[in-house]
Amino acid sequence: MDIETFLAGERAAGGYRCGFVAIVGRPNVGKSTLMNHLIGQKISITSKKAQTTRNRVTGIYTDDTAQFVFVDTPGFQTDHRNALNDRLNQNVTEALGGVDVVVFVVEAMRFTDADRVVLKQLPKHTPVILVVNKIDKDKAKDRYALEAFVAQVRAEFEFAAAEAVSAKHGLRIANLLELIKPYLPESVPMYPEDMVTDKSARFLAMEIVREKLFRYLGEELPYAMNVEVEQFEEEDGLNRIYIAVLVDKESQKAILIGKGGERLKKISTEARLDMEKLFDTKVFLKVWVKVKSGWADDIRFLRELGL
């Protein structure tokens, strides 16, 4: 028996806990920002725009008493405009299938019909913790108003517990971890203690480029795009990464590239800097644009993309 196996057994004998936690909610309630703060590192993309998360991202946080394996899901789509949205909703449902705890995120002082749609998808026999996010908003700073809002939402579903946080500012994140911990099963850790995600460097590079697309383009255009890593080469002291951005129309390609290529250059530069920080190495990044008409309704193609 090696030392890691022995120590893992000692942890389990001492009541160590480890389990899966799904983070769910309607689009744009701050799920990805919350997960990034929970694990202490940015691995899930964030944006003020809805539906920035398309793939389930697994983040891992480990301390001396528990290991939390968080699954960040796409926002549940109530507008089924195409096959892509249907696939995103399927991702949410699949993520809920094998978890030990569900964290249901809502925006402070704003509970909508879209939130209720998500509630109806939640498993009946899995503990669900209500998390009221964005308590830094002015309307949520009134303690009594916030308490009344939490009571209103708790009346909609049989929640195991509730917590109010500000994912943006990292407020009450430690409290939330302690709230989740008792609902995790006693188990040895599933991952090494220094591991923060099970996603590959290729996947993280793709997500970084997607985040920049959402940041620098208009309200609708990023939803008509997909990002593919065509090549990822790791050398001594340098990662060479080649990424294609897929769009539906030539007109979208022109918008993405921008006048004189300035917009694409800005997106590429900021993405490269973020990758160098995340991978702790120099990065050569090449980003270009491809046109494939109707890709968001092509079910076979979506499967090839892993969506």
From Swiss-Prot:
Region annotation G5: where it falls in the sequence: 165-167
Keyword rRNA-binding in annotation: yes
Positions of GTP binding: 25-32, 72-76, 133-136
Membrane-topology annotation of the record: Peripheral membrane protein
Residues in Era-type G domain copies: 17-186
A single MF term (Gene Ontology): GTPase activity
Region G3, residue ranges: 72-75
G1: region residues: 25-32
NCBIfam families: era (TIGR00436), PRK00089.1 (NF000908), small_GTP (TIGR00231)
Protein name: GTPase Era
Species this protein is from: Neisseria meningitidis serogroup B (strain ATCC BAA-335 / MC58)
